[in-house]
Amino acid sequence: MAGKRDKVRMISTAGTGHFYTTDKNKKNTPGKMEFSKYDPVVRKHVPYKEGKIK
């Protein structure tokens, strides 16, 4: 039986191509996640949006 959590890729909105990977419970958070994290390429905190893992 499949797990309840999906792996997702958090992609920087700064356009640097930097991303973090995490997982989310698709039952509790059905929408797209978005939060602020540190982007080492631009050396500041920027919003990261959820994307698919290829």
UniProtKB/Swiss-Prot annotation:
Sorted alphabetically, the Gene Ontology cellular component annotations on this record are: cytosolic large ribosomal subunit
Keyword Zinc tagged: no
Pfam hit, one? Ribosomal_L33
Ribosomal protein listed as a keyword: yes
Name the Gene Ontology biological process terms: translation
User: Which molecular function term from Gene Ontology is one that the record holds?
Assistant: structural constituent of ribosome
The lineage's top-level taxon is: Bacteria
Please give the InterPro entries that the UniProt record associates with this protein. Answer: Ribosomal_bL33, Ribosomal_bL33_CS, Ribosomal_bL33_sf, Ribosomal_zn-bd
Going by the UniProt record, its keywords in alphabetical order are: Ribonucleoprotein, Ribosomal protein
Q: Which family does it belong to?
A: Belongs to the bacterial ribosomal protein bL33 family.
Task: Tell me what this protein is called.
Answer: Large ribosomal subunit protein bL33
What is the primary gene name for this protein? rpmG
